[in-house]
Regions:
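Catalytic-site neighborhoods of secreted/periplasmic enzymes
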Residues: 1-66
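C-terminal cap/loop subdomain of S1 sulfatases and analogous C-terminal strand-loop tails that border
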Residues: 15-24, 34, 196-202, 223, ...
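Active-site rim elements
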Residues: 63-71, 151-163, 207, 227-237, ...
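A long, amphipathic alpha-helix that forms part
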Residues: 71-88, 123, 146-188, 249, ...
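Active-site His/acidic residue clusters
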Residues: 82-127, 142-156, 199
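Beta-strand elements within well-structured catalytic alpha/beta cores of enzymes
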Residues: 92-99, 161, 165-168, 172, ...
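Histidine-centered active-site microenvironments of extracellular/periplasmic hydrolases
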Residues: 105-111, 177-228, 238
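Long, internal low-complexity/basic segments
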Residues: 146-156, 164, 324-375
Length: 375
């Protein structure tokens, strides 16, 4: 089995997601144990997990019982800042700081929660998906159990999430301060992004595993060495472009065959609004999505059968699924012919995925239902 060091990582400080336990400890668990706080945190996470399994919703998440400087996300930032300050310098470095938040639980400490009043935050898109509903979305609606969510519930959930995001922002600031204190901030590329978004009540959904904007559209903030004048771009980009950009910034060659397109030249961000024609996203090997500057289409990964089509120009809230509309046949055909072949999905990959499912590595309801469907 390949380990992180086999991929070139030299200094590894691995965390156990948000819930270190007696069976799966980590550096953060040791940190809390040294302060006599591990039991407090484990009691909290046990309470949260029990509630989640019994149907508790994110607006019910209690705040962290730990002070801010002992929260796992601040601990993560503190470790990164210490690494920066202790680094002897004189050599380039790549530092990847992976916060566990703002993933559930939405457990920001009380001082961060106090920054947001539920009655002042915006409401999510409360309209549930209308027919036709894709099998993927139907399953996640069933899993989310938000059909009884009120506006009060929604605002509470959003305010808790905003507080958690602000906690992450605090951690990012700690890392940037360390770079500045070291005198290398203006010599460093800083890229802020995420692996996925959060539905946060939009369409009566939560978390991820769908391709609505709440889950698929994520932040990307790039600061080149020395900074630059602030600007926004609407060009399409995705994670493979970040990889291509980092290797170009480092003066390295391309990483094999890649769909990535660099958005940097030298130490500058390219001022180019042309972007890519298509970007993609996938939920394992269940469903695949492609998007251009106007349309977003989802297909069943195995059969390539279209299940969702949205006109993002006319319907930015994604309320009307046009997948069966005869007037959009040419759009569907274009995506099937131009966009999805690039993903290279085939029967062999599907068979490999089915074998992984059968070994029990995917145990959530969504995966079990799909395994039954595949068989």
């Amino acid at each position: 089995m390949l380990k992180l060091r086999d991929w070139g990582y030299q200094d590894i400080h691995e965390l156990r997601d948000v819930v270190p336990s007696k069976r799966c400890s980590c550096y953060y668990a040791d940190f809390l144990a040294e302060r006599g706080r591990l039991g407090v945190y484990q009691d909290y996470t046990r309470l949260w997990w029990t509630g989640a399994f019994r149907g508790a919703q994110p607006w019910e998440d209690p705040p962290s019982p730990l002070p801010t400087d002992e929260h796992i996300d601040v601990y993560c930032a503190s470790q990164a800042a210490s690494w920066i300050r202790d680094d002897p310098g004189g050599r380039p470095f790549y530092l990847q700081v992976c916060f566990t938040g703002p993933h559930t639980p939405f457990d920001a400490p009380p001082d961060f929660r106090s920054l947001y009043k539920p009655e002042e935050v915006p409401l999510p898109i409360l309209a549930a998906p209308d027919n036709p509903v894709s099998p993927q979305v139907a399953q996640m609606l069933k899993s989310a159990r938000l059909d009884g969510m009120t506006e009060t519930h929604a605002r509470m959930m959003v305010s808790h999430y905003y507080a958690k995001v602000t906690l992450i922002d605090h951690g990012v600031g700690m890392v940037l301060d360390a770079l500045a204190d070291k005198g290398i901030l203006d010599d460093t590329w800083v890229i802020y992004t995420s692996d996925h978004g959060e539905m946060l009540g939009d369409h009566r959904l939560k978390q991820k595993k769908v391709f609505y904007e709440g889950a698929a559209r994520i932040p990307l903030i790039v600061r080149p060495p020395g900074g630059t004048s602030a600007r926004r771009t609407k060009q399409l980009t995705d994670h493979v472009d970040i990889c291509a950009s980092l290797t170009e910034a480092a003066g390295a060659g391309a990483v094999g065959e890649s769909m990535g397109r660099s958005f940097v030249t030298g130490t500058e961000v390219v001022d180019d609004d042309s972007g890519k024609r298509y970007v993609w996203s996938e939920v394992e090997s269940y469903y695949s999505m492609a998007r251009d500057d106007r349309y977003k289409m989802t297909v069943d990964s195995a059969s390539r059968r279209p299940v969702e089509l949205y006109d993002m120009l006319e319907d930015p809230c994604e309320l009307a699924n046009l997948v069966f509309e005869s007037g959009h046949r040419t759009v569907r055909d274009r995506f099937l012919e131009e966009a999805f072949p690039a993903l290279g999905f085939d029967a062999a990959k599907l068979d490999a995925f089915k074998r992984r499912l059968a070994r029990g590595q995917y145990r959530d309801t969504f995966a079990r239902d799909l395994l039954r469907r595949f068989n």
